[in-house]
Amino acid sequence: MARTKQTARKSTGGKAPRKQLASKAARKSAPVSGGVKKPHRYKPGTVALREIRRFQKSTELLIRKLPFQRLVREIAQDFKSDLRFQSSAIGALQEAVEAYLVGLFEDTNLCAIHAKRVTIQKKDIQLARRLRGERS
């Protein structure tokens, strides 16, 4: 930011400036240590909105492939041991799971907005599933 020349202004007769506390004055007059610039921070929510727009534009899978594959194999072990999967079958399962979760989170967000909140909660997911008829 460029520095600008300050010019004298005529007082408008408002309140007299209050005296600062000694600690505040000392803090303001203390020199900046070595000119270290603090890192830039965005306002709360800005990065979240940017991520929402980015993920809504994209079509790639959001869950990593190998962890998802391990989870599928672990769940399948409970039903039958030594099951084998084609890679296309794992891919189809992952597409279906992600589509289901995205839809569930959309409905959950609508439930939170209906309750005049912006944060989704466990009860919103439960209500969304109940309205869908997935669980009683």
UniProtKB/Swiss-Prot annotation:
Subcellular location: Nucleus; Chromosome
Transmembrane segments: none
Gene Ontology MF terms in the entry: DNA binding; protein heterodimerization activity; structural constituent of chromatin
N6-methyllysine, modified sites: 5, 10, 19, 24, 28, 37, 80
Modification type N6-acetyllysine: residues: 10, 15, 19, 24, 28, 37, 57, 65
Processing after translation: Phosphorylated to form H3S10ph. H3S10ph promotes subsequent H3K14ac formation and is required for transcriptional activation through TBP recruitment to the promoters.
Keywords, in A-Z order: Acetylation, Chromosome, DNA-binding, Methylation, Nucleosome core, Nucleus, Phosphoprotein
Organism classification: Eukaryota, Fungi, Dikarya, Ascomycota, Saccharomycotina
Residue positions where N6,N6-dimethyllysine is found in the record: 5, 15, 28, 37, 80
Stated name of the protein: Histone H3.3
Domain of life the protein comes from: Eukaryota
Modified residues (N6,N6,N6-trimethyllysine): 5, 28, 37, 80
PANTHER family: HISTONE H3
